[in-house]
């Protein structure tokens, strides 16, 4: 048994106290900044939040997903090693004061069942991760990280010194004490290292995963009162530069894994946008320097305009970050700076003057379909694509859907005064134009109960986005959801067609934002037996490149974002590709 002098005990107390004080100071500094953010955290749906923590923290489902199963398992070895060594660490320091948590029997049992196995697994895990970072060097991990190297050395040292002690490999009292102090020094070193590095996620990620909004994307509403005083409008504009509390917590939680950049369609298409840096890491130091969350103006403007707002970055993040901040920088640029890119000025002017994206009159389709009356079951919301003939081929799709409704005996009608849902204005940051369109639409739609549309962008806005500003009294469904329900109810029967290989491209708004991947497949499989999945499908779908209002930038010739998915489809050698979105189409 090692004996410690009073001086050694005092040195240990001072060392640990300074480490804990530094750690707590840095933690509280960050939390103080986070609490300056706008919009409070929500803790509704408590059982679902706890289940999410269990799945994503304890089971590591997100960490081990997206083609990173091996890295995820290695990370789990390290994380569980820290958990199982919690009691061992407490006992280790109490030994210096002659206190022992374990009797000899329990100590040996714990060593055999947990200590020894996890010491080896933890060492193997961290060495495998170090090999991946320093030898394989995945692009997503970014530049060389000396801190990661130090952490590797620290963890391996902890495991070795623990095993040396437990296996009685040292006989000399001096050697035993040196080993003990080395182990203690490394643990104390972590207290100084963690707060100043990405490894702060060890503390923050469980809380971030618990607190993160269920809604994707999650951007606080920006209500604009046209009758507000000049002071109130000034405060609104100042507020545009501030992050919300959950966005600020995201930035301090980031583990710098680069998964967001890996899946970003703009980055993959050759653009400058790097979500890991532009939306997260580049804001971290400005927040620490200023002690505040007024950092939206630090986001790279050009990168912000490249974003398709597809939410792939948010979907893949293993620590619960809502990564995308294009909405914040665009709203700041448009509303606070009055800076609208040239390619979008006509679009916004059309929305303001005519209520639709094209500044066009209604197509003949509006006259060919029945008008909605209160005795009908559904409002068929056409959207700009169909109502204003933005794509003549899409009008044929709308007519085919109405044939399905007719066959099922479902009554429906269209609204003659339907305005654009405002999605392009919302995505471009013009919240004033968006609110004007929204107010008109909500006034009409709150008179009905059920709405269906073929445009996922319209579904997101009519249902989810509008509810941030208004009480919504109606329900909106995507047309594939309606078809799937009619199939389940036996109201329509489909004879499998003669189509050969058929695949499906998941629209981002339908799969990630609305969490709907089953309904379209139910409908397709009923008609096409030879169905297969694309490489990136479901909630892992690859954006077509038209989201975030970038469809109106399609003639710019910049980047290859819009070609990536098309190339995947061609390489799949499918005969037919189906999609549930007019923009993807």
Locations of the language-model features?
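Feature representing long, continuous alpha-helical segments
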Residues: 158, 255-258, 262, 277, ...
């Amino acid at each position: 048994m090692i004996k410690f002098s009073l001086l050694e005990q005092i040195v240990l107390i001072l060392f640990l106290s300074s480490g804990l004080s530094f750690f707590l100071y840095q933690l509280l500094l960050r939390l103080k900044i986070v609490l300056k953010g706008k919009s409070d955290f929500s803790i509704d749906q408590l059982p679902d939040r706890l289940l999410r923590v269990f799945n994503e923290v304890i089971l590591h489902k997100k960490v081990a997903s997206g083609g990173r199963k091996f890295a995820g398992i290695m990370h789990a070895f390290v994380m569980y090693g820290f958990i199982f060594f919690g009691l061992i660490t407490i006992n280790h320091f109490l030994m210096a004061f002659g206190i022992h948590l374990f009797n000899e029997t329990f100590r040996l049992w714990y060593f055999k069942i947990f200590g020894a196995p996890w010491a080896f697994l933890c060492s193997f895990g961290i060495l495998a991760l170090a090999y991946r970072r320093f030898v394989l060097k995945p692009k997503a991990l970014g530049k060389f990280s000396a801190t990661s190297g130090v952490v590797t050395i620290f963890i391996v040292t902890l495991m070795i010194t623990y095993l040396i002690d437990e296996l009685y490999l040292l006989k000399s009292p001096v050697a035993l004490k040196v080993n003990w102090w080395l182990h203690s020094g490394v643990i104390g070193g972590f207290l100084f290292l963690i707060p100043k590095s990405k490894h702060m996620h060890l503390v923050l990620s469980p809380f971030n995963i618990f607190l993160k909004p269920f809604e994707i994307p999650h951007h606080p509403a920006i209500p604009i009162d046209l009758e507000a005083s000049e002071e109130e409008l000034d405060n609104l504009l100042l507020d545009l530069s501030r992050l919300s509390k959950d966005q600020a917590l995201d930035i301090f939680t980031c583990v710098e894994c680069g998964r967001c950049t890996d899946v970003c369609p703009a980055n993959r298409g050759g653009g400058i946008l790097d979500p890991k840096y532009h939306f997260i890491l580049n804001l971290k130091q400005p927040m620490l320097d200023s002690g505040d969350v007024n950092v939206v103006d630090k986001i790279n403007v050009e990168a912000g305009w490249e974003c398709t707002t597809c939410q792939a970055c948010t979907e893949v993040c293993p620590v619960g970050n809502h990564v995308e901040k294009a909405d914040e920088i665009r709203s700041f640029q448009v509303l606070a700076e009055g800076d609208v890119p040239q390619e979008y000025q006509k679009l916004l002017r059309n929305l303001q003057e005519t209520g639709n994206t094209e500044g066009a009159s209604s197509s003949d389709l509006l006259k060919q379909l029945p008008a909605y009356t209160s005795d009908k079951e559904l409002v068929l919301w056409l959207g700009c694509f169909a109502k204003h003939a933005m794509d003549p081929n899409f009008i044929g799709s709308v007519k085919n859907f109405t044939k399905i409704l007719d066959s099922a005996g479902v009554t429906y009608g269209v609204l003659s005064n339907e305005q654009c849902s405002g999605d392009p204005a919302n995505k471009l940051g013009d919240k004033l134009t968006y609110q004007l369109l929204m107010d008109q639409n909500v006034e009409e739609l709150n008179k009905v109960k059920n709405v269906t549309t073929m445009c996922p962008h319209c579904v997101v806005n009519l249902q989810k986005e509008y509810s941030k500003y208004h009480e919504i009294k109606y329900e909106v469904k995507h047309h594939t959801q309606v078809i799937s329900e009619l199939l389940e109810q036996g109201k329509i029967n489909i004879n499998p067609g003669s189509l050969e290989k058929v695949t499906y491209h998941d629209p981002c708004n339908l799969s990630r934002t609305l969490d709907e991947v089953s309904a379209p497949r139910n409908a397709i499989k009923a008609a096409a037996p030879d169905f297969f999945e694309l490489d990136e499908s479901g909630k892992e779908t690859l954006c077509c490149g038209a989201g975030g209002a970038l469809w109106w930038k399609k003639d710019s010739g910049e980047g290859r974002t819009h070609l990536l998915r098309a190339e995947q489809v061609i390489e799949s050698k499918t005969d037919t590709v189906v999609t549930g979105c007019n923009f993807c189409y």
